Each structure stands twice: as C-alpha cells, then as structure tokens.
C-alpha cells in the first residue's frame, strides 16, 4: 500500500510525561475509507495517540501525516480534515436533537443548516426523535447524535475514542451500525476501544497497543493466524480475538522481562 492510499501514516511517534513513556515509537497506517481499531487496555496510550493525531497534544518525537498533511507543519489543515468524538457525548441536553445539529451547522458556516440537520437525523435513525430535547434521549441516541454532529462539514477522517463506553448492549449495536455506515460512505474511521467484540465486529484492520507500542497489526484473520486452532472434544476451535489479545500481550510482557 502506498502513502497515497493511507488516510493516516504514523512513524516512530513518542510521548512522555516526565519519566513515564506513554507512547514508545508507534508505527501504523490507516487505509482510506476503512475502519481501523486501536485495541488496548486502560493506560495503553490509545487516547494519547488519538489526541496527538487530532492536534490536541504534541508528540515528543516521530512523524505523522493525516489526510496527506504533515502533523507538525500543517496542523490547521489536519484539523480541517478530521473530527474527534470522545467517550462522553458532547451534546446540549436542553436543546432538541435537531437544534443541536443546526447550531453546529451554523457554527461551521453550512449553507443550509436545516437541511444538514434533517439529513443527519435520517442517516442516524433519529428523525422521529429530532424534535425532542436531548435530555430525554437514551445513551445510545446521544452517542449517535454526537457522531452525527461530528460529521457536519463532511470531514474525511473521524476519530472515535471509546465510543461505546458505558452503553447497554442494544445502544452499542446502534453505535456499531452508525460506524459501519460511516465506512460504507467512504469516511475513514480510527476507533479506540478496549472491547474485543467491538473491534471484531467493526474493524477492517486491528492494532493492539500495549505499554505504548504496537505489538501486532493486521486483519482479524491475520491476528487469528498467530494462534493455532485447538481441538475441543474432537471439534477444531478457531482462536478468538480475545485469545489472540491475551496471548500476544502475555508474550510481550514475558519478552520484556526476560
């Protein structure tokens, strides 16, 4: 894959806080129009990496390009090409869902804020709830509205940092459907998660970040090939992503302690 095929390319990215190394030479490539899942435990450095790529934080070393723009030299162009949503929906609970969208569309100087709002409400299955105050929405509805708001202005790249944290199973599925819809429309999605099933359901490619380093990176099939199938009562059982995650993290820890 050439650099032109990548929406995001990262080489040797490093971040420290005092003596604590959060990111230790991260390399990764995210293909355009794909869903890339960055999988890791709490404290692995996932959110720090996303904040650096979104220009919220600066790296101590390394290089990155986002939508063809150099992160260090063209931060403004990077910001114009991305949208970032965090673990908690940044919506105004007093306003209706439609009013939230119209407000952001006006702030982003859209020609027809009302049309933008109605289109996004339909895209995320919120048309019937558009006239209701967001304070009455379920967690999944708020998160979908938050993602919809992040798409105003049609950014080609969306960062979703732990988008289903704290949601019930049905709400998580609703958000998953919204994320797949983004990729189907050509948007590049970089998703951070600690939920293995989320990465398994959504991602075209998965990287495992452990103690500040990418220790494996590939498709789900690639990762499963890292472990051999086992026989359970004469039935061959393929490894799950959970099996792979636990094995590679354990191997990495053993290698570092040896």
Segments from the language model and where they lie:
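ABC ATPase "signature
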Residues: 217-218
